Amino acid sequence: NAFKPQILSEAINLELDGLDMEKVYALKNGNQDDELFKYLVITQCNALSAILPGMFQKIEDFTELLFPDNLLRDGSVVEQMVALIPEEDWKDQVQIIGWLYQYYNSEKKDDVFAALKKNVKITKENIPAATQLFTPDWIVRYMVENSLGRVVINNLKYDVWSDEEKTKIEQFKEKWKYYIDDAEQTPEVEAELRAMEHNKYGSGEVEPFIDTTFIDPCMGSGHILVYAFDVFMDIYLAQGWSSRDAAQRIVEKNLYGLDIDDRAAQLAYFSVMMKGRQYDGRFFKRGVQPHVYAIQESNEIRYDEEFGEFLLEEQHRDTLRYLLEVFRDAKEYGSILKVEPRDYLGFLNAWELSAEATLENVMMIGWYTGAKDTVTALAWQAHLLSQTYNVVATNPPYMGASGMSPKLSDFVKMDYPATKSDMSTVCMEQAIGMCSDYMAMINIPVWMFLSSYEKLRKNLIANNTFINMVHPGRGIFGSDFGTTTFVIGKGHISGYQGTYHRLFEKQVEVE
């Protein structure tokens, strides 16, 4: 009652860094398949840590004790993943791990909501399990195509481009099946759109569209980022780039992501890296690392002034103090934290160089060694949170005010008074503040109807433009509370005619 993974039958032919072939032969000759499988998986993970450090950490001896037994038995999790999920579902479908992770958390989620009924608030440790919902593929495509895709199509449509360049619009639309064309606009609106787009990307100073930035501030396992990668690739290939060069630039310059869940962020990192590998067979050898991060806290770092003396410039010492202050209990708040714009990249450079200054001070060496990685993470997440992006697209966490911890409740009341009743609307307000062109989101439609959101609605209409909306009603997340998904343009265009679809008026199926 056992199955035999391919890695076992090919064990003696494997070439892995750190693989002890004598041990392989000994385990194989002794018919110790379980131990051999365990050894090969651990060795493979350690080898992968060199090229995928954000996903695979080196497994130490004590960690090996936690490795589960009996993985080769019929009915084990490994056997079920192989037997129950068709092989074709794994091919070019790296986002499948997001589905698996959501269901991995489902038991914990049930426990959290059972406790909530007893008035036990959701702690920061349980926020990921309680609030994560995997986004259906068609909604991901709708959001990305109508935000990131619209950045390109609107510019080609309204700026001064040759007829040859404008033919790319139809090429993109053939690929982007969920892209919704603009409604017919008045001459006055079209004139305003032309003025907005004129020389935005086609001035000749920068190659069009390649500096477009895209962030998912609640990225989960990276489903939205993975499809944004594909859309960016369509854009680059249309510009004449090779897929190899485009993959590297997309990861380095275009895609960004944040989440409070460490493990989900690892999966997002893995998904983006595997997407790069899909387009470039040598991608792992190029030393490129994506800008996707799990929000970290500063709680464990005790900072005394003398520890900061090796940062020679006062601005960097002040930035260190600020980082430790603003990210205290950061996993309680995640991407809704409002972070000052500072020279965080300059601070990072100074922080990396400061290691030499600690060599003559034993106390400082110990402190710096313990704080180094965390402070680096704090600076990177501060950099991402302090920027604006052409496109922000996300499926935010869902948690009503009644489930919030006292700290989180006080925070949103202070910083987000117009949207404080639910985390999804708080994230909506934050996302609009982060974008310069378009914001795409799926959330619950309470903000569309309840009187408590009247101020938000007035602000949205006065300062932004609704491009389009798809209102599916119930059923997107199973037996749920209803959803709406939409794209908002930054800045108000008076008289703009949006496009709206109600999918709940009759039973429909979206492919």
What are these regions (language model features)?
Residues 124-130, 252-255, 410-417:
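Short helix/strand-bridging catalytic loops that position acidic/His residues to coordinate divalent metals
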Residues 220, 252-255, 443-444:
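Catalytic palm active-site di-aspartate
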Residues 2-46, 228:
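Extended, well-ordered alpha-helical scaffold/bundle regions in very large, multi-domain proteins
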Residues 6-11, 15, 55-250, 264, ...:
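Class I S-adenosyl-L-methionine
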Residues 178-213, 361-393, 409-417, 425:
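Flexible, glycine/threonine-enriched loop-and-boundary segments that flank and lead into catalytic domains
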Residues 1-2, 99-106, 270-277, 377:
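Short, hydrophobic/amphipathic alpha-helical patches that form generic packing surfaces
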Residues 208-215, 224-387, 391:
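Class I S-adenosyl-L-methionine-dependent methyltransferase module
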Residues 2-6, 226, 233, 237, ...:
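Signature of N6-adenine DNA methyltransferases within the class I
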